[in-house]
Structure formats: C-alpha cells, structure tokens
Amino acid sequence: MNNPWSNFSSAFGCPIQIPKQNSNVPPSLPVPVGVFGVPLRSGCSNQMAFCAPELTDRKPEHEQKVSKRLNDREEDKDEAAACSLDNQYDRKIQPCIDLVDSLRKLDIGNDLMLPAIAVIGDRNSGKSSVLEALSGVALPRDKGVITRCPLELKLKKMTAPQEWKGVIYYRNTEIQLQNASEVKKAIRKAQDIVAGTNGSISGELISLEIWSPDVPDLTLIDLPGIAREAVGNQPQDNGQQIKTLLKKYIGCKETIIVVVVPCNVDIATTEALKMAQEVDPTGERTLGVLTKPDLVNEGTEETVLKIIQNEVIPLRKGYMIVKCYGQMDFCNELSFTSAIQQEREFFETHKHFSTLLDENKATIPHLANKLTDELVGRIIKTLPAIEKQVHDALQQAKKELQKYTQSTHPTVSDKTIFLVGLIKAFNEDISQTMHGKESWFGNEIRLFPKIRREFRTWGVKLLESSAKVEEIVCSKLPKYEDQYRGREFPDFISYWTFEDIIKEQITKLEEPAVAMLNKVIYMVEEKFLQLANKRFANFQNLNNAAQARIGCISDRQATTAKNCILTQFKMERIIYCQDNIYADDLKAARAEGISKDTKIKDLAFGCASRQCPSFALEMVSHVKAYFTGASKRLSNQIPLIILSTVLHDFGNYLQTSMLHLLQGKEEINYLLQEDHEAANQQKLLTSRISHLNKAYQYLVDFKSL
C-alpha cells in the first residue's frame, strides 16, 4: 500500500518532506508549515479544496457500506498522527482569524481590504439553517426577510470545557449573553433598533461573538436573503436595497462568497448565484453550498451529484452539501452533537450521496473545515498587502496631522517655526504657479494653460480685425472722399485718411484687451485663494489674513495693469513704424493684392475713381501693411503686460506680504488658532493613527508566532 501522505503538501504552497517509514508502522509526520508558520490541516491537499479519501477498502455494495459505517466504526491507524497535526493547525487558526477580527474591530475598514466570508442566498434557501448549524444558536425566523442587517458571526472554539458565552455589538452597544437561547431575541432587538420595525433593510453591521467548544474558529458575514418582492409592510424597494447591500460586500476582491442553494431548485435560476457570477465571473472566490438534500425528488439525485462534481456551473472552490437541523430541532432542544450525528447518518445511509461523505464534501463539520481553510488561506495570502496598506495609511495620516498645531507644536517657538513652514510652503506654491509648475490632480488644469487660452483668443481677435481691413477700407473711403477731402485731387492717397482709419481700428481693440485682463486677473486671484485654502484650511484666522492680502493686491494690480494697457493703446494711436519694417510689410501687402470678394467697382469716388480704382487698391495695401505690424505688436505686448503685472508682480507682492505676518510674534497664537472643525479633524486623525499603530503591532505580533 502506498504511503497515504506521499502527496501531502502545505495548504499554502510549502511542500513537506516525508521520511520513509515501515509500511506496517504509522508514519511519524513533520508538521507542515506554510506562510507565517500556519500548518496544514490534516487531510487537506495543497488546493485546499478536496481532502484525502479514507484509506479503508470498501465493498461496492451500498448495503455493505452502510452496515460497515453504522456497526463498525474503527479508528484509522493514522488517527494519532493526524490528530497531532490537527492540534498544531488549530493552534494557528485562531490567531490568524483573530488577527483579521482585531483589524476589523479597529474601524479602519476604509484603509484596509480585509479578507472575509460573506454568505448569501435566495429567500428560503436554507441559508439561516446553515449558519445556525455552524454557530449552534437559533437565529430569528419571521415571515419575509430574516436577516435585515449584515450580521457578523465570530465563532471562537474553546479547547477546554467552558460555559457557552456570547456578546452582541451594535451602535456602540455591547450586550453580554449567558445562554445560546438569548441570541435570537438579542439579534431581533438589534435589528429593530438598527433597521426599524417595518421590515426595512439597513447596511449597518451587527456583530455577534460566540465562544463554545462546539463551534469552529470562523468568522462569517450573514447578508439578507434575496427577495423577489416585498412581503407585508416592507418597503417596495426592499429587493433593490438588498441587492445593493450584497454587491457592496461580495464585490470586494478579498471576500469569499458562499452561495447557499437548495437541492430541489434549478441552480441556474437562483438570484444569489447570478449575483456571485456578476462580481466573480471566473468563480475564483465562490463556494456553493447545497441544502435540503432530503427534499430531492426521486430520480434527480444524479443531477445534484453533477452539480457537486462541478459539471453544471463550475466554481473554483467547488460545492458542498449539508443537511441542517430545522427550527423544530431547536424547539425540541436537540443537542449539537446529536444533530451532527443525525446529519452524518443521513449521508452514510443515502444511496447516492454517501460517496460525497468519503470525499469530505458533505456535512456541516466538513463545511466548517472547508470554510476555515479557505479563510485562513485568504488571510495568509493577503497579509503582505494588508501590511503595506497599514503602513501607507499610517504614513498618510501622520502627514495630514502635521497640518495641525495643538498636539505637535505646543510652545510659542515651535509654533513660530511651524508658521514659517506654512508660509514658506504657501509661497512656494505661489512661485510654482507663477512659473507654470504647480501640482495638479486628476483632470485639473494648471493656471498657465487657462491664461494661454485667453491669449490665444486675443490673437484670433487681432487676426479677424486684420482680415477685415479690405472691407473697412472699401466702406470708409467713399465717406472720407465725400465728406473730408480737401483741395487734393481725386485718387491721391490722403495720409490723414489712412491715419484716421488706423486709429479707429486700434481703438476698437481697447475694450477686448481690458476684458481679457479682467478674466485673467479673476483666474489668478481664484488660484491664489485655492492655494490659501489648501495650506491654511485648518487655521481660519491665517486663511482670512491671506485672503485679505490676495484681495487687496488683486485690486491694486488690476488697476495697474489696466493703466498699462490704456497707455499702450494711447501710444498705438501715434501712427509710427520703422521705415524698413513698414517697407517690408507694404511690399508683402502689395504682393498679396486685394481679395476677390472686395467690390471696388461699387466705390463711388467720382468719375476718375470709377475708371481707375488704383487709389483704393493702394489705400488697402497701406492699411494692411501698417495693421500687420501693429497686430504683431499688440499680440505680444498686451499679454506681456498682463503676465508681468497680474501674475508675476501679483505673486511677488503676495509672497512679501505673507512674510510680514511673521513680524508680529504676539499674533502667532491668533493666526494658528484652530477652528472647531479642525480640532475635531485632529482628534479623528489622532485616533486613526492610534488604531493604525495597533494594527501594525498586531501584524508584527502575528508574524512572531
């Protein structure tokens, strides 16, 4: 006979070296140790999905197998070694599960993705019966939804004979339970307080801890059964509320999903399995549990077997089958041991399902072992990631706490240094913004690209004005010819006419330039205010001082910039250009000619003009030539004025003004006075850091086991 442990390996990937043994002597086994020193439960393969078959030879006849199980229950020769292995495994299970329970109790769920087992099922699927069998306590049973809040079941196995003990937690309430019979009433009361008495659903967690020698070391989260329609006085949207709540829990990548399905229904139609497939399409995190095998119609047993053998809807973690004791068993005070014995006898004597017992795929004890193995395996696998999450969250919380003063900067000297640091950081933000290097997040746009957009619009405005020169000349020349021509002969180019047309066009650009200035200064002021709110959010007085300076400097720089722009346009109305530059622009304008759309023939200059439109052509060329140079000048000059006065000077003056706050040392306490909201936030951060430090210590202590 082959050594039964030859293929044995750790549940967490660590192979075991088995020494050669005499075939007639039970093997002496080393304890397999996985990651963080967790040994493998006896009888489990490295996949943690199937257990080693029993080693006794059995005859194929069903009657002989039943007789052998019921009348001759000899212990296997390897029981001693296996029991020793189980004991060492069990000593590691509880610390492993307690670790995650302790982390979850610290209320740092937003920082960590903790492994969990969530139990879901359609209404009347037998979900509550499975949980009752695992926990050994009766749960509330009402018409409609039984579980109306997420119920966390923390089962703690006691090694030495001790009295049963339980504790229920909800809304900062802790109630001690002295007897298992008190659980049902306590849960119903908690659900009524948390979710109300009208059958509503709540996402608030209720936690129940049970210590008993008859329970496995296991933590489960019982979720409301999926209801297709409301019952009684329940809200009509109960079904949707339940689905939303379930997706919140089973959608977490670290959650193992236990789907409870009755044997006497079409598994493909169950809502619970459909929801599990939505969030876990590969079935990697899902375990199916079939219930009510005693209600299977005769002739359909093979269909159930195919489901359990993963031939219908495959799941990576496979399927198990259980027969739970019902409410009547609780009423008759059927003991836990007797109920387990009855379930085992059912499978041992069943013509079709007895083989499942051989494969450890049936009964509540095997389900408990399976769930424990899966949870421990998930915990071990995610411990490095959890440790990193705790470390990162702790560093981030400490960084945020540095924004506050009361606990970290108690003395005036410390506060002065802290204020210097705050102002220095703010001034650095201003400097980075001035040079277009400020930090940004997500889809946020930096300030300089926003300003550049306005400058681009200004450039387009100048191009449009330049393009309209021909049309303007054609519309203005008749008026100047008829109303303003002096003693000059027709077709002579009038410099005064040329100058008036240029001045009029330049003046029209003054208003858009000032409008652009106002837009840009609003952007700059808004950005600087955002930076002040970011750096000084926890210090209202300091923030107010910064905002007052920003507003004052903004008004002053807006006036300065506007005066500079008006001065620039005043100079532009003095028609002047270097001869060589103008000559080049005129040459280019003459070469380009007048566009085909210009209707020179419609000009009414007099007889001579109508016969020869050269005067109009020449005037258009001169106006275009000058306006080309003026446009280039204004296209750069106005943005330079705005950048200089509204961005750079504004930023420099603001930085200097903020440094002046350091001169009044008697005002430091006033400036660093925290508002009520900031004080509360500081307390929350301090508490969060304390919890994260505890979490980190839990991880360190666990690794040292």
From Swiss-Prot:
PROSITE patterns given in the database record: G_DYNAMIN_1 (PS00410), G_DYNAMIN_2 (PS51718), GED (PS51388)
Known outcome of mutating residue 548 to V: In strain: 25, WL-F and WL-N
Residues bound to GTP: 121-128, 222-226, 291-294
Consequence recorded when altering residue 5 to R: In strain: 16, 17, 25, 7, Black Minorca, Fayoumi GSP, WL-F and WL-N
Region (G1 motif): 121-128
Keyword Cytoplasm listed: yes
Residue spans of biased composition, Basic and acidic residues class: 60-74
Limits of the GED domain: 616-705
UniProt-annotated location(s): Cytoplasm
Consequence the record notes for mutating residue 317 to E: In strain: WL-F
CDD domains: DLP_1 (cd08771)
Region annotated G2 motif, chain positions: 146-148
Region feature (G5 motif): 323-326
Record keywords, A-Z: Cytoplasm, GTP-binding, Nucleotide-binding
Effect of residue 152 to K: In strain: WL-F
GO cellular component, one term: presynapse
Outcome of swapping residue 143 to E: In strain: WL-F
Chief localisation class: cytoplasm
MF terms (GO), sorted A to Z: GTP binding; GTPase activity; microtubule binding
Record's function text: Does not show activity against influenza virus, VSV, Thogoto virus or Sendai virus.
Family recorded in the similarity comment: Belongs to the TRAFAC class dynamin-like GTPase superfamily. Dynamin/Fzo/YdjA family.
Entry protein name: Interferon-induced GTP-binding protein Mx
Protein's organism: Gallus gallus (Chicken)
Gene name linked to the record: MX
